[in-house]
């Protein structure tokens, strides 16, 4: 009888802890080429068309992913820049540029935050090494003409290119 109650309690707790928008979970992979770990960001359909603020749960999820990569020693990640998998008709050029700008600025802030935590000065006044991160910002295929050019032109104005920051174009 006690075992049955315990099992029912576990099932109830599992049902009560459903994933919400912005939650992140992680899976390990050994059969994917060059991928060992995948962070999954929980989103909903409103992300396809809604404007984002810096307080949106999905951007907080990206922040948690960046923080986890530092904690786990992961130095290379791919982030969908528009936070969508596929282009759709309602994604105007203006919408894409606004979304990209918001994600650019948030990712930059998250990187500055984690680099401030892990790249401070050492005891005795010496400088510790600052970690090197490769962030691949990916755009969905099928975007309107001119979107890629406008979004890539925005990159150096937000990240203020320095020798340690480079922008590479990779065609699918």
Question: Predicted regions span which residues?
Answer:
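Macrodomain-like recognition of ADP-ribose-binding/processing modules
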Residues: 1-172
């Amino acid at each position: 009888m006690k075992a049955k109650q315990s099992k029912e309690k576990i099932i109830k707790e599992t049902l009560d802890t459903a994933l919400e928008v912005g939650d992140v979970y992680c899976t390990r992979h050994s059969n994917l080429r060059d991928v060992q770990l995948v962070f999954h960001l929980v989103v909903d359909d409103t992300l396809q068309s809604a404007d984002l603020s810096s307080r949106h749960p999905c951007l907080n999820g990206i922040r948690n992913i960046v923080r986890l990569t530092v904690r786990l020693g992961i130095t290379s990640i791919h982030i969908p820049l528009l936070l969508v998998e596929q282009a759709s008709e309602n994604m105007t050029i203006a919408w894409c540029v606004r979304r990209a700008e918001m994600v650019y600025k948030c990712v930059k802030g998250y990187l500055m935050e984690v680099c401030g935590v892990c790249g401070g000065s050492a005891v005795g006044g010496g400088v510790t090494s600052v970690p090197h991160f490769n962030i691949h910002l990916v755009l969905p295929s099928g975007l309107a003409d001119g979107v890629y050019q406008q979004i890539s032109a925005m990159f150096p104005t937000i990240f203020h290119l320095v020798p340690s920051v480079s922008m590479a174009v990779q065609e699918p």
